[in-house]
Each structure stands twice: as C-alpha cells, then as structure tokens.
Amino acid sequence: FNIVNDKIHLTISRFFGPSLGKVNIPDSLIIKLNNYIDEIIAKDTNEAQLNDYGPNLAGQVKQEIKLPKHIVEGELLDYLISISKLYVKLSTTQEITKFELMSTWIVRQFENEYNPAHVHGGHLSGAGYLKLPNSFGKTIQEKKKNIHGNINFIHGTEQFLSKGAISEKPCVGDFYIFPHYLFHSVNPFIG
C-alpha cells in the first residue's frame, strides 16, 4: 500500500514475511551526498581511504566510504528518522520511541563488482541510490530479463503464494527500508 505523509511517499510491499518499504530520496539529499563523495574523490587526498568502510562490509567493491558525522547530522538524519518511524508504524502499528543510527556509508560500485547476500546489525536497514551507470550491460541470453545491477531481497523459500526472493532494477532516488535480518544482495553489472 501507498502512504503519503507531509513530505514522504512510502510504499510498503509484502512479497514474503517481512515488509519492504520504498521511498524517494529528496533531490537536496542526493545532491549533498553526491557532492561530498565527488569532492573527496576529486581532492585525491586520503580522506576516502581514511573513511574506507569496506573491510567491515560484505561487498566485493573497491570504494565503500563511511559518512562522517557532519554529513549525517541534519537533513539526512532527520530523513532517516522520519522514514523509519513511518515504516515501523505502517508495518507493525507500533511507534518508535528511540532512534539510534549505527552507521551510514556509500558504496561506489563499478563494473563487475557486487555485494553478496548479507544482513546488517541493528533493527532496520536501508539501501539507496544516488547515481547509476548509463548502462548495466547486455544479457548473454537476449530473451531473459536483464538483472545486471539489480538489488535482491531474499527471505525463506519460494512456495505457494509466497516468493522467496524479489529483484528490483534501481533508479536514482530509490531508497529501500527493511528489517535488518532481511538478506539482500546487489548484482554486478557490465559496462
């Protein structure tokens, strides 16, 4: 179902046990986060290396950059709190009384890199898209659906009236929110 709050349009889907929320990241946040990453990469300093969060994560990617406190505080934190509260209320009818952000990072995924199936700590997780390549590449089998670069959500096994997994083609601005225990992965892309 779809819920429109003052500023948030949240879609909740139940493809399997846990609910999956999807919202759009405000353009102002996309610009702020992209500018921050572009600046530290362009400076050619060791800031990107100092903030390298890759060793703590499941991904097989070269650049996973932890966001510093000054970038998270303010608009980004307020946004994450708002969507978390709305997601929990709509999924469970419960109210969040305490919110603690454990960590945030940006994954810069390039050709042939991927994130294997994994879960996170805490209670809720999220994944958003700030930039995407012009092309995810062609499939080897032309008649098959192109899932290059897709994000996958996996829960249980496929059975009557229940999918075991879904695969979503990302768009810039998509943000998914889900329980921390929901396995998710990101496919590699070509080109």
Language-model region placement:
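Short, intrinsically disordered, charge-balanced linker/junction segments flanking boundaries
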Residues: 190-191
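Short, charged beta-turn/beta-strand-edge "cap" motif at the junction between a beta-strand
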Residues: 182-185
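Catalytic core of non-heme Fe(II) oxygenases with the double-stranded beta-helix
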Residues: 102-177, 187
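A general secondary-structure signal for short beta-strands and their flanking turns/coil
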Residues: 16-18, 99, 121-123
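Non-heme Fe(II)/2-oxoglutarate
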Residues: 1-94, 105, 112-115
